[in-house]
Amino acid sequence: MGNRALIIFTDGERVSPVVYLHWCGDQVPAWLNDLKQLMRGREGDVDYSCARFIGLCHTQIVGNLSLGVWNVPTPIERTVRAFPTTDRSREQLAAYGHGDAGVVIVNAHGLHLASLRRLPA
């Protein structure tokens, strides 16, 4: 069905749109390493981190499919802000994920993964 991932950037207050990857979920860690180089000096900038990540994805994904972006639904936005502090936030993100590579929450301060694991759908 794919190697899907949903990537969301946050600083604990602001939350980016969701970046959807259909085939490249396993590439997220490598692309985040590339993003760290691009974002030097702008650590913590949720909007630019998300935008530049989308740009990196765009250069790697051929055609007009397999890369999407949409607004985070309000309940998920609240959940992202609470993650990883509660079991409930993990459950809600698991239910929101599309399976495969799961939901990836990226801390915009230093672009570290707050979560990168398969979450059951």
Please place each PLM-identified region on the residue numbering.
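Short beta-strand scaffold segments in enzyme catalytic cores
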Residues: 4-9
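Short acidic-glycine loop/turn motifs at beta-strand connectors
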Residues: 10-15, 107-109
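Short, flexible N-terminal segments of the mature chain
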Residues: 14-48
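Low-complexity intrinsically disordered segments
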Residues: 35-121
